[in-house]
Amino acid sequence: SANTFYYHFQDIYDLLDKWLDRKKNQFFAMTQLTGSWTDRLKVLLHAMQENPKLVYHVSDSITRERLERYVFTSIESQFYDLIGEKTAAMEITDETRKMMTSFFCCSLLGYVMKFLWVNMNVDIDASVDDLSIIFSGALEAMLRKEMGQ
C-alpha cells in the first residue's frame, strides 16, 4: 500500500537511489579483486549492454543532473585511490590529487553519457582500452607539469 511505501521511502526517487546504491555496492564487492579499473569498467559496460531496457528505464527516470552526480560520486573515491597509488612515490599535494580526480571523473562521466547516447552500440573492450591510453597519457602529462618538467 502507499502507506507502507512511504514508511520505507520518501518518494520514488528515494527508492531508486537505494536500489542504485545496492546495485553499486554489489558491483564493487563483486569486482573488487578484478584487475584494473579498466577491467571493472568493461564488466560494468558489458552488463549495461546486456540489459538495455533496465538501463534506459533507470536513466530516463531521473534527471540528467541526478544521473551525473550519481556516476561522479560513485567513481570519485575509486579514482582518488588510484591516483594515490600511481603517485605514492611522488610529492603531490592533496589539492592536486583532488583536481586530477575531478578531471578523470568528469572525463569518465562524459564517456558513460556518450555510451548511453549511442545506444550502447560500442566495441566496449577496444573503446575502454583507448580510454585507458588517453588517461595514462593525461596522468603522465599532469605529473610532469606538477614536477616542473
Regions found by a protein language model. Name each.
Residues C106, W117-Q149:
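C-terminal peripheral helix-coil segments that are non-catalytic and often amphipathic
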Residues T38-K53, S102, C106, G110, ...:
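Amphipathic alpha-helical segments that line or abut small-molecule/effector binding pockets
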Residues T31, V55-S59, K86-A89, F115-N119, ...:
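Secondary-structure edge/capping motif, primarily at the C-terminal ends of alpha-helices
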Residues Y6-Q32, T38, K42-L45, Q49:
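An amphipathic alpha-helix adjacent to DNA-recognition modules
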Residues R22-M30, S107-V118:
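Solvent-exposed, amphipathic alpha-helical segments
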Residues K18-L20, V43-S74, F79-K86:
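Amphipathic alpha-helical segments used for helix-helix packing
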Residues N3:
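Key DNA-contact positions within bacterial/archaeal DNA-binding proteins
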Residues R64-M90, E95-G110, I133-S136, E140:
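Amphipathic alpha-helical packing segments from all-alpha helical-bundle domains
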